[in-house]
């Protein structure tokens, strides 16, 4: 082990997550270990900037915020190693979407409070989706998506529908919210 790999192993311990900064939908995201780190890093050369972060195992939990209100959460169980682009958009991926999520009420409230706080701290408008990992009884906020997907496979519309808001109503809410912006 030498050079950058040695430094990264000291900072994070493998495995690590490699991802381009300006992409979405997990495009270009890799879970790298010592053995495949260089190979995966080479695949990311086309991107201007990349992020290297600690890999956190655990359950995939997503929380949606609508305006300044907590909307709800969903759990994902991908058949693949993690919820990557193929797990999101391939018809063969068969990622399970679990709603309602089987967690304690206090944990549910905790996740929603963190998602709402992230939404407010980042000065977000409209709809956001915060991605969490739940591991060893703790929630880890991975990121807050300020432009979550709005397709028939997307999570926010699914969460909204579970809580009584159909897709048409969700889109109307977003349009109305946008109309309140003063330019």
Language-model segment annotations:
Residues 151-154, 161-173:
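Internal helix-turn-beta structural module
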Residues 81-87, 151-159:
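A short, polar/charged loop-to-alpha-helix boundary motif
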Residues 1-58:
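Active-site nucleotide/adenylate-binding loops and adjacent lid/helix of ATP-dependent enzymes
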Residues 54, 63-65, 119-150, 160:
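Conserved metal-phosphate-binding beta-hairpin within the catalytic cores
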Residues 181-183:
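Conserved small/polar residues in nucleotide/adenosyl-binding loops
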Residues 72-75, 114, 118-125:
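Active-site anion/phosphate-binding pocket segments in diverse small-molecule metabolic enzymes
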Residues 34-110, 134, 138-140:
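Phosphate-binding site of ATP-dependent enzymes
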Residues 112-116, 168-176:
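Amphipathic alpha-helical segments that line or abut small-molecule/effector binding pockets
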